[in-house]
Structure formats: structure tokens, C-alpha cells
């Protein structure tokens, strides 16, 4: 199959290099990724500045196109310009260094790149290794290959992305795959005021993870049980169970 591959850690990050290495054993892989790390850029796109897409080699071999934009930019320009004549079967983003659980998906460039694929009408998958300090991207790539072999891409629901999180254990110790829902995992942020060498104030964001009550089927709990967590996400965010009550407040 034809795969468009992107990420938010940058085109020369170990996660995307490893994933391409594994995927291209069975598939045709086309890489369009940010020229530098663009983590936590969300779903921003570039509208008032030019985008450059430069060909990049890994060793002596062409690897992909590096774009001076966001992860969502990369998917857009990959689908609609650089490889507009290619019929892609799936868009994959990753492998990310660190988890994308709960509200992480709102900020994640990794997830946003995959969601941009969904906006364009393509099946899409975001992949993250929960282990930030020492992620095993080879194990992550094995998980992706396993998932791809099982998916029915011809019966994919519209505007849908799979958010895949891989636990911090060796591949052979993973218990399997579980379909999950987003956890109520968020952050309590605070800003530490500091001084630069010239005495000017600047702020550094820090924070603590808040784990609200989560059932056993949340992405966070499933990961901690030793399973790969696969959460289907939709491009559309309407809160349907609030519509009727909101009408009673405002449509009067």
C-alpha cells in the first residue's frame, strides 16, 4: 500500500526513521515531515508565510521532504502538492517520543498530523511510545505493522483517526491490543518567572498531571495494564448530549 508518513519530532528523529525502515519492507512509504521538532504545535497551519519542501537524504539515500511548517502543514502539502498524483491508502504520524493520552491530543502535533489526513478523507493513524526517556521505536514499529495487517482500510469511517499509544514494556511482554476511550488526563499548569542574563523576566511553563477518575477502559489505564491502547478519534467535536439543554437556555 501507499503510505504518507509524517510526525512532529522532525524528519531526522529516530521515531520516523525507524518506522519508515520497517514499513518500507512491505509498503511504499513517502515521508513529508517538519524540518525541525514541532512538538505540541497542535493543528496550526501556515497561511501567511511560504512553505519550503526540501529533499532530505539519510546517508546516501533519499529519505523524504522536510517542510518549514507544522505537522498539519506537512500532511496538507504532501497530499495536495508534493505527492498529489499518488493514491494514498493511509496517513501515519509518528512514532512520537512520549505519550499522547487524554487531553494531550488537543496539543499534539503527532495527532494533529493524523487528523489532517482524516480531514482530507484518508484513513489515518497517530503512533506514540509512552516511554519518553528511552523509547523503543523498533518495538513501536512492530506494533504498527501488526495493526496495519489487521485493519480494513476499505471500510474506514469518515473523518476518523486511530490514536495508538504503546506501553513502556518490551514487545514480547505486551499483552495485546485494547480499544479504548480518551482518559480524563489533563494538566495543572503553572509558570515560573525567571530572569535572563540581562535581567529581563521570562516565563517557563511547568505542570503536574491530573488523573481524574478513569474507568478500566481509558487509554491511560489500559497502557498501565500492559496493553497497546488504540483510541478512535473524530475530527468533529460536537457535544451532542448537551444540545437539547443548551437549546432550552438560548432558543427562547
UniProtKB/Swiss-Prot annotation:
Pfam families: SurE. GO terms for molecular function: 3'-nucleotidase activity; 5'-nucleotidase activity; exopolyphosphatase activity; metal ion binding; nucleotide binding. Its main location: cytoplasm. A divalent metal cation binds at residues 8-9, 39, 96. Keywords: Cytoplasm, Hydrolase, Metal-binding, Nucleotide-binding. Its EC number is 3.1.3.5. SUPFAM superfamilies: SurE-like. It is found in: Cytoplasm. Its cofactor is a divalent metal cation. Coiled coil: none annotated. InterPro entries: SurE (IPR030048), SurE-like_Pase/nucleotidase (IPR002828), SurE-like_sf (IPR036523). Binds 1 divalent metal cation per subunit. The keyword Hydrolase applies. The keyword 4Fe-4S does not apply. It catalyses: a ribonucleoside 5'-phosphate + H2O = a ribonucleoside + phosphate. It comes from the Bacteria. GO terms for cellular component: cytoplasm. HAMAP family: SurE. Nucleotidase that shows phosphatase activity on nucleoside 5'-monophosphates. NCBIfam families: PRK00346.1-4, PRK00346.2-2, PRK13935.1, surE. Belongs to the SurE nucleotidase family. This is 5'-nucleotidase SurE. It comes from Petrotoga mobilis (strain DSM 10674 / SJ95).
